[in-house]
């Protein structure tokens, strides 16, 4: 009987020792100790990996609140969204407000205009016959570095009124029904709406809220030549130039 008790006691001691060793080893792994087990490699100088959680916005929630919808993300630099439709080097910069509203002042100026302000060209167009190709077509003298992106749309947008546009009507209570419309994808801002009308402002605000308060290019309009910088307007002579400039809100 005494031998059995000794064997049982020895077994319990071994089990307790194994459990203590396992807990001590697990604690050292979590705390980043210099203890290196034979089955793994620990690098204390390497930071732990983190995960970025994107906020999810649902257009069916009141005022585009947080819910279950499309994921909204930011660039890998975690800085700001890339401005749409711009020329980095030799593009066009609007110097005065247009007819229906001023341009966002956040648009960066041209890179080539940062070092010098005044640039003069001859009254005659510099696009001479010598830069034509073998087929007699004009060769583009300036290479434009532009970043383009398309807004997501749906079939419901095609059924809207192009002139009047959609009204920013949104249900306040989701208890009765849940709308299937997504303002930033399905609703259209009509041609007659501009920045002077409350309806257009409310619709634009609703569209921005439905996609996580990210601004977007809603509509486009033509920019007269006199609204461009003088150097660009002189460089592209109207008599031979075929460059069409479009300003997007």
UniProtKB/Swiss-Prot annotation:
Signal sequence region: 1-20
The entry's keywords: Signal
Family: Belongs to the IIV-6 117L family.
Taxonomic source organism: Invertebrate iridescent virus 6
Pfam families per UniProt: DUF5850 (PF19168)
InterPro entries: DUF5850 (IPR043882)
Name this polypeptide is given: Uncharacterized protein 117L
Domain of life: Viruses
């Amino acid at each position: 009987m005494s031998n059995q008790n000794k064997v049982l006691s020895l077994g319990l001691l071994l089990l307790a020792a194994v459990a203590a060793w396992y807990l001590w080893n697990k604690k050292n792994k979590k705390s980043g100790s210099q203890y290196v087990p034979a089955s793994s490699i620990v690098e204390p100088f390497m930071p732990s990996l983190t995960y970025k959680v994107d906020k999810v916005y649902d257009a069916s929630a009141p005022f585009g609140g947080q819910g279950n919808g499309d994921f909204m993300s930011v660039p890998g630099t975690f800085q700001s969204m890339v401005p749409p439709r711009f020329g980095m080097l030799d593009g066009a910069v609007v110097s005065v407000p247009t007819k229906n509203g001023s341009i966002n002042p956040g648009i960066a100026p041209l890179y080539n205009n940062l070092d010098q302000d005044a640039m003069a060209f001859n009254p005659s167009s510099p696009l001479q016959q010598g830069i034509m190709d073998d087929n007699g077509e004009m060769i583009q003298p300036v290479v434009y570095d532009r970043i383009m992106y398309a807004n997501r749309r749906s079939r419901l947008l095609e059924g809207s009124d192009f002139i009047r546009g959609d009204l920013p009507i949104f249900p306040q209570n989701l208890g009765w029904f849940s709308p299937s419309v997504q303002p930033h994808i399905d609703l259209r801002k009509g041609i007659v709406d501009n920045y002077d009308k409350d309806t257009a402002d409310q619709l634009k605000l609703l569209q921005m809220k439905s996609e996580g308060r990210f601004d977007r290019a809603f509509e486009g309009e033509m920019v007269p030549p006199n609204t461009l910088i003088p150097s660009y307007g002189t460089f592209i002579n109207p008599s031979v130039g075929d460059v069409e400039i479009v300003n997007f809100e």
